[in-house]
Amino acid sequence: MSGLSEKEVFLLLSSLQCTHGFLGTFDCRFPGFINKVKVQTAIINTGPREQGGIHWIALAWDPKSYQMFIFDPLGWKNDQLMKYYKFSYSNLIKRSALSSPDKCVKVIKNSQSVQCTCAGSCGLFCVFFLYCFYKYKSNAFKNCLFQSLYGSIPSLTPPNPTNLHKNQDFLYKFFKEKSLYFRQNEEYIVSNTKIGLIKSHI
């Protein structure tokens, strides 16, 4: 097994007290956000549940700023996501009934990768992002915590994996400090998310 399971994702979020408005973990058939007036978050897999899933991404809705945040740890663009996973951000947005006659939804997505393709840590990065969202809301990306991560050009073979590996070290330190569940299960979680788990670069 590699990566986080749905149960582990929820338990990590719970340990960080980040479950207010959390709709759950979903596969590629996520129905979308439907409540315009409440904070909502979700962690979605780009693959079908019955096939074990492929890659986690995170979604968050801030009704105050009317912004939907999409976070992909690998930073893929829509065409790349479709090419690699047969998954579309556009379809995801369309399924969310958040627009109104007098307000347009502003979609904000990261354009850089923060995770190395050699690691199985997409679930951990998604939990970290939702922590940033709950703490900073409309500044989910533009805050000192998230900006502690190095950004890189999205690529199957990262041009500078060293910086992305530093992000992983930062992530483990963050969870070790903030999450009792992580501390209690550190060896198991690290073994399933560690750098070098997937052969993607030398």
UniProtKB/Swiss-Prot annotation:
Keywords: Autocatalytic cleavage, Disulfide bond, DNA-binding, Host nucleus, Hydrolase, Late protein, Protease, Thiol protease, Virion. The record marks 52-53 as: Cleavage. Requires DNA and protease cofactor for maximal activation. Inside nascent virions, becomes partially activated by binding to the viral DNA, allowing it to cleave the cofactor that binds to the protease and fully activates it. Actin, like the viral protease cofactor, seems to act as a cofactor in the cleavage of cytokeratin 18 and of actin itself. One of its GO terms (biological process) is proteolysis. It is found in: Virion; Host nucleus. The active site is at 55, 72, 122. It comes from the Viruses. The keyword Protease applies. Its EC number is 3.4.22.39. Its main location: virion. GO terms for cellular component: host cell nucleus; virion component. It catalyses: Cleaves proteins of the adenovirus and its host cell at two consensus sites: -Yaa-Xaa-Gly-Gly-|-Xaa- and -Yaa-Xaa-Gly-Xaa-|-Gly- (in which Yaa is Met, Ile or Leu, and Xaa is any amino acid). GO terms for molecular function: cysteine-type endopeptidase activity; DNA binding. Interacts with protease cofactor pVI-C; this interaction is necessary for protease activation. All late proteins expressed from the major late promoter are produced by alternative splicing and alternative polyadenylation of the same gene giving rise to non-overlapping ORFs. A leader sequence is present in the N-terminus of all these mRNAs and is recognized by the viral shutoff protein to provide expression although conventional translation via ribosome scanning from the cap has been shut off in the host cell. Belongs to the peptidase C5 family. This is Protease. The lineage of its organism: Viruses, Varidnaviria, Bamfordvirae, Preplasmiviricota, Tectiliviricetes. The gene is L3.
